[in-house]
Regions:
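Cytoplasmic-side transmembrane-helix entry/capping segments in multi-pass membrane proteins
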Residues: 1, 48-61, 83-84, 108-118
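Membrane-helix interface residues
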Residues: 20, 46-49, 108-109, 170-172
Length: 176
């Protein structure tokens, strides 16, 4: 399930970028802690939030909605509400992945195995989804593009996710 949610998050991000800006997607993607706090407190008693944490969470959510309000109204800056809603869904999928790991025995799996599983599921499902959608595949690589992909793979998709999985295994998710 964690691998499917992980793949779905990235599929959602791809679709989102066709309907809103990368900066708006980033903000909505990082609503993941909201979803974790809302859902994990129901499933794991040790993850309960104190009243002041709930107040802070609500204030942060209202601030995000206020900052991005022009995309929610007709005639707003490009009317990006569809993309914003999908971005919120991508954030929810990331949150659900975290909840799935933290609230199950998956939290005992080593970070590198968890990352491998999630990437393996994505590596199979996302190209199949791309083919099913009739996406054109262009392979024009430059040295810069190759180096950029290598940096993103090693740092963005390996080191950062290993650290995240390690943190989930050692600390309450609502405290990270």
């Amino acid at each position: 399930l964690a691998g499917v949610l992980f793949a779905a998050e990235f599929a959602a991000m791809y679709v989102v970028l066709q309907h809103t800006t990368a900066s708006r997607l980033t903000v909505f993607l990082y609503t993941s802690p909201f979803w974790v706090a809302l859902l994990l407190t129901l499933l794991v008693p040790a993850e309960r939030l104190r009243r002041v944490q709930w107040v802070g969470l609500i204030c942060a959510f209202v601030a995000v909605a206020f900052a991005l309000r022009e995309g929610f109204v007709q005639g707003g800056a490009g009317v990006t509400w569809r993309g914003d809603l999908l971005g919120l869904a991508a954030g929810a999928l990331w949150g659900l992945t975290t909840v799935t790991i933290r609230a199950s025995r998956l939290v005992q799996v080593s970070p590198e195995k968890m990352l491998f599983y999630q990437v393996a599921v994505s590596a199979v499902t996302l190209p199949l989804l791309s083919a099913a959608l009739g996406e054109p595949w262009h392979w024009q690589w430059s040295a810069f593009a190759g180096a950029s992909i290598a940096v993103q793979t090693v740092i963005g998709a390996f080191v950062s996710y290993l650290v995240w999985m390690w943190l989930l295994a050692h600390y309450p998710a609502t405290k990270i």
